[in-house]
């Protein structure tokens, strides 16, 4: 029975036996290919194995099989997150530099669509910022700057404490960006903004000490 196979697959995933779980999910799909949610489970299992290429392939099958009304910004976001995971993977053997760059470019494209589909949410722009930061790890080109600035403006307009950690991320990037540009007054403004939220923030304190 396909239900038994899918249940067994879920059990194996819970036991962190991801390779075996993928086999059982595959058996269930062979018996009933309308169980599109199983592609998501297969994707999750591959991700837990740090096999992002297979995770992305499985998730794309899941997403493509969804009815139009289920293709929400949230389901699309997960695809972008997988591309981001591949692009920032610490496994240099599994992910080659060319694949890493392509994955980050794909992540940026997906998060752009998320932003367009959910313009009132900051998450699409935040993940565009993170993705562009990963493409510019030394912050030499400031690729993430416009996205962090946009997120900052969006969150300041909401004026809610639950966004403080995201604001600190924005301020940290911008503070470092202006520090590299030797624009010390502007850099100090951002580090002080962090301390206004979190007076014990060690990174901000260290940056300000260095500017002095």
Residue map of PLM features:
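Short coil turns that delineate tetratricopeptide repeat
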Residues: 33, 67-70, 119-120, 199
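Residue-level recognition of tetratricopeptide repeat
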Residues: 10, 44-47, 81, 85-88, ...
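Structural motif corresponding to the intra-repeat A-B loop/turn of tetratricopeptide repeats
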Residues: 15, 49, 86, 101, ...
């Amino acid at each position: 029975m396909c239900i038994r196979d899918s249940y067994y697959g879920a059990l194996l995933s819970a036991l962190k036996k991801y390779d075996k779980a993928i086999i059982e999910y595959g058996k269930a799909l062979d018996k009933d290919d309308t169980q599109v949610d199983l592609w998501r489970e297969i994707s999750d299992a591959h991700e837990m194995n740090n096999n992002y290429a297979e995770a992305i392939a499985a998730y794309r099958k899941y997403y493509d099989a969804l009815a139009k009304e289920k293709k929400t910004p949230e389901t699309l976001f997960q695809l972008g997150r997988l591309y981001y995971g591949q692009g920032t993977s610490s496994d240099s053997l599994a992910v080659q530099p060319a694949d890493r760059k392509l994955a980050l470019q794909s992540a940026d494209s997906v998060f752009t669509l998320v932003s367009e589909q959910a313009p009132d949410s900051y998450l699409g722009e935040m993940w565009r910022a993170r993705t562009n930061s990963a493409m510019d790890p030394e912050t030499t080109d400031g690729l993430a700057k416009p996205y962090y600035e946009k997120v900052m403006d969006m969150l300041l307009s909401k004026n809610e404490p639950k966004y403080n950690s995201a604001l600190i991320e924005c301020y940290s990037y911008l503070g470092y960006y202006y520090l590299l540009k030797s624009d010390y007054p502007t850099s100090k403004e951002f580090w002080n903004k962090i301390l206004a939220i979190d007076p014990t923030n060690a990174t901000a304190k260290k940056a300000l000490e260095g500017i002095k």
